[in-house]
Every structure is written in structure tokens, then in C-alpha cells.
């Protein structure tokens, strides 16, 4: 029988799955549940050692002899510090050593409890990875614990070998051994490049061709990649391709971009048909919360993430494989190896998303964004600020010749204007930025800048506060919290824009918007930068948006 502590069960199951079966066990009470579970399991070869200093070096010997990682497990407190010399040796000798330390719960560190000291990160730069496991209470805790253990174990042999540290807080009671078997756990594997002569490579292609419902999601990418026509034809027909405007030209063929609205409108009985069996991802951040929620609630059987750095990124909670290589090289490598069967799944998604109409909003900040996108000149740069702007822009089709930029690394409201000004300063094309009032006024010193050029045009959406907060489900602002949450204001950019040499346009209705947009989007160079300030009512904007989504549900 094994310990009932779920974080211990995850750890032991993953040690076995990753082939780490030689473990040095040191005495103690806090680590007794770990020791009992490891020593009871027939898949592990356990070695008893009393002195942690010697135990660490003994484990190094085990790892050196077999070439595979070995583990050493100790109790809490100074027992862990006694492993420090061995950890240093393993680091500088590039030996895959897994240090497992039991710990008190975080609440008792520094409270005069016995055998306690701050254990997470204690080895600092002498380990390749250090993780502190959660005590599992929820499904999210279990996913997090599983991911952390996978990350640590994968790092023992990633860009060279070396030691890692796994710290496990364990609450009392400690000695409840009531579990009969280890759980089935998700094992994350990593391929460092794909070589056609590797056996593992063949297994990957076999798994790829096993699935008929294959989806590729492309996150933010600030580049253009033109696939060869032969690869485009092969890749496009075998996968559903989803991306957003910030994915830019990094997809073979024409991707589905209105999936967020499609997911909102999708009836529950259709979700099974639309859920992928295999999900492949590359690129950076994805904006759509609906897509993340959908794939977390309806996980694929496998999720492969392809990136040059090979980091474990589990956005959808179902990651099974990390492929460390350039994503475009990966796609072109697998293209000729796809089987000849053309699945129906991509057409199912495309046909469904074609039924979602592009919105026709009344005068609002959404209609202003739509008016700009429809009037943009070819081959310009479009900068989208965060919060509502980046989301509303996704409701419209942006021509593929237009480069789309957005600060989605941290998705904050600060710096969007400064980034666009800096980009335009080094650009030879027109640069348009769409920005909300809070983002603009927060970053207004971006215009206090001698490097602002005439190729910059700013569409400022001013509805007197943070409109997006009016659309958040479950947020009740009927009381006094309204003015604090939405940052209500009565500020205009007119004086500041004119002071900084901008041509200023004020818009308060649909007719003025249409007229001002002609000047704002003219492709010819102008003598000064332009700022168009569109005023709207945030309550009305929120109502118009809710009505649009309500109509989608009625389809």
C-alpha cells in the first residue's frame, strides 16, 4: 500500500515513467511517506544510506555507472543542506542527479517549527531546475504538480545533463498508507530535433497519422514565413489551422480566424465533433479565452508544442510532447510523411466558421475599429493595444498583407503607444495604432518624444473609462466600486495631441467617423502625424456588444 499524499503518488509514478528507478533513501519522519512508497514499489531499486553527504555522492556513482539519472531522497531541514556538496559536484560534472526533499507546509516555515528552513530554491544556480510541488486539493493542483515533476525530470538531460531539485511539502497525518496502486499519470516527452534516422522519429509520424482530427493553433509571431507551394498543399488539407491577427503570415493557406465567435455560438451537442484528437501548437501567446477554456474542458488525446527553445508550455492543460526545433522546419519535414487520406475534419471547422457573420455594429468603439480595418491601405502596420481593442479587432477580417503587432508578452495596458511610436520611428510604411483611453493616457508621454514621425496615426477610443469591465460576466458594479474598477474620467487628448504637432480629429457620431476616416487612412504621406479621438458611451458600447453575441446564440 502506498501513501495517500497525491503529490507523492504523482512523483513516484513519473519517476518510474521517466525510467528513473535507482533511488538512495535517507532516514527521517517527514520523508517517510516518500520512502515507504518508493521502497514498496517493485519497479525501484532502493539503497539505504544514513549520512546525506555520503548518500548524495553514492547517487552520483549510480548515475555515472549506468548513464541514467539517479535520485536521492532526504527529510526536511538541514538534511537537505548536507546534499549541497554532491549537488555542486553533479552540476559541474554534468551528472543527472534528482534531489527529492520532504518539507513542512509553507505556513510553518520561519515559525519555530522543528526541522524547518526555506527549502525551495536552496541550491540556487547549482541545479538546472528547482520545483516546489503543491499539496494537491483540486484538479488544477494535480495538473500543476504533474507538470512541475515532468519539467524537472526532463531537465536532467536537456542542453546537457545535470542535477534538479524537487521539494515536496507534506502535511500531517504523514503515515496513512491506504492507496493500492499508483495513478495513471500524464508523461511529457521531449524530442530535441527530428532526425529521420531516429527510431523515435518514426514513432512520432505513426502517431501523427493515427489521428484524423488534427488541429494546429498558431500563437503570436512577429514575422512572415512563406511555405513552399508543395508543402502548403500537403499541410493545409490535413489540419484545421487556427490563428489570430497577431499570428501574421505564418500559416500555410488561409487559416480560420473567427473561431472565438464560433466557439461562443457553438451548441453543446456539436463540441464532440469539433474537438481535435491531436493538437499541435507553435508561436507565442493566444488572446482568446474561449479557445483556452474550450480545449481545457475538451482536451485532445495528445498535444504537441513545437518551439526552438524546447520549453514546457502547457497552455491547454493537455501537453504530452515537446518538440525542440524550428516550427517551420518541423512542418516541412512532416508534410511529405502525412498519409494520403484527406480527413473531413478541417472542412467541418471551415464550413461552420463561415456561418458566423462579420458584425455590423451601430456607432461604438467596435464600429470604429471595424471602419479602420476595412479602410486600411495595403502593406501598413497595425498596432493593437491590449484589453478590449485586441479582442474587438478579432471580429473583423484583416488582410494578410497587413502586419499586426501587440504587446501580448504580459498583456498589460502600459507601453502600447510607446512601442508603436518606436516601431514607426524605424519603419518606412504607415503605422496605425488602435488604443483605448486608459492605455493612451497611461502612456501619453510616448508622444513627448522628438522621434515621433508623420507615418504614425493613432485611433484613440475614448468612452470615459474601462469599457471592458462592463462586459465581464459575474462582475457586479452597481455599488460604489464602479468608479474604482473602471477608472471613470472626462479627459480628452486634444490639447496634448496638438501640442505635440498632431493633426487632431474629433469624432462623436457615425457620419463624422466616416468622413474623418478618409483622411486618417489615406495612403499618401502627410506632413504631420494624425490622432483621431472617437468618443462613445461605454454603457451603450457594452450593450451593443452583448446584443451581437446574443444574436450569435440565436443562429
Curated annotation (Swiss-Prot):
Gene3D superfamilies: 3.40.50.970, TPP-binding domain (3.40.50.1220)
The reaction(s) this protein catalyses: isochorismate + 2-oxoglutarate + H(+) = 5-enolpyruvoyl-6-hydroxy-2-succinyl-cyclohex-3-ene-1-carboxylate + CO2
The protein's name in its UniProt record: 2-succinyl-5-enolpyruvyl-6-hydroxy-3-cyclohexene-1-carboxylate synthase
GO MF, one example: manganese ion binding
EC code(s) of this entry: 2.2.1.9
Lineage: Bacteria, Pseudomonadati, Bacteroidota, Bacteroidia, Bacteroidales
Requisite cofactors: Mg(2+); Mn(2+); thiamine diphosphate
Family under the similarity heading: Belongs to the TPP enzyme family. MenD subfamily.
Recorded metabolic or biological pathway in which this protein acts: Quinol/quinone metabolism; 1,4-dihydroxy-2-naphthoate biosynthesis; 1,4-dihydroxy-2-naphthoate from chorismate: step 2/7; Quinol/quinone metabolism; menaquinone biosynthesis
Pfam families, A to Z: TPP_enzyme_C, TPP_enzyme_M_2, TPP_enzyme_N
Note accompanying the cofactor annotation: Binds 1 thiamine pyrophosphate per subunit.
Subunit comment: Homodimer.
Entry-linked HAMAP family: MenD
UniProt-listed GO biological process terms: menaquinone biosynthetic process
Keywords from the UniProt entry: Magnesium, Manganese, Menaquinone biosynthesis, Metal-binding, Thiamine pyrophosphate, Transferase
Role this protein plays: Catalyzes the thiamine diphosphate-dependent decarboxylation of 2-oxoglutarate and the subsequent addition of the resulting succinic semialdehyde-thiamine pyrophosphate anion to isochorismate to yield 2-succinyl-5-enolpyruvyl-6-hydroxy-3-cyclohexene-1-carboxylate (SEPHCHC).
Enzyme class: transferase
Gene for this chain: menD
